[in-house]
């Protein structure tokens, strides 16, 4: 069984037991969180779509770790004007492990 969930403004296709990284969620490591924005559920050939959410469907996940992604370098330049700007960014993330999909 799989589910399509929405968290942090993005959509993820998840399966029970899978680990994946999402935008930072303020939760302690080891705590269980419930993701209730389930957009679709699937099992084999049957697929259940929500409009926009599947009623009564939830995904239970455990917080594995918090961290930061690799640095993204931003370089801006105006030709012939001697203008150069360097900038970097590291986005925070939370790693989750899916415990169960209910619905």
Curated annotation (Swiss-Prot):
Q: Please give the PROSITE patterns that the UniProt record associates with this protein.
A: RIBOSOMAL_L21
Q: Which InterPro entries match?
A: bL21-like (IPR028909), bL21-like_sf (IPR036164), Ribosomal_bL21 (IPR001787), Ribosomal_bL21_CS (IPR018258)
One GO biological process term is:
translation
Question: Which UniProt keywords are given for this protein, alphabetically ordered?
Answer: Ribonucleoprotein, Ribosomal protein, RNA-binding, rRNA-binding
- Source superkingdom: Bacteria
GO MF annotation: an example: rRNA binding
Q: Name one GO cellular component term.
A: cytoplasm
Please give the HAMAP family that the UniProt record associates with this protein. Ribosomal_bL21
Subunit notes for this chain? Part of the 50S ribosomal subunit. Contacts protein L20.
State the family it belongs to: Belongs to the bacterial ribosomal protein bL21 family.
Protein's job: This protein binds to 23S rRNA in the presence of protein L20.
Write down the NCBIfam families for this protein, in alphabetical order: L21 (TIGR00061)
What is this protein's record name?
A: Large ribosomal subunit protein bL21
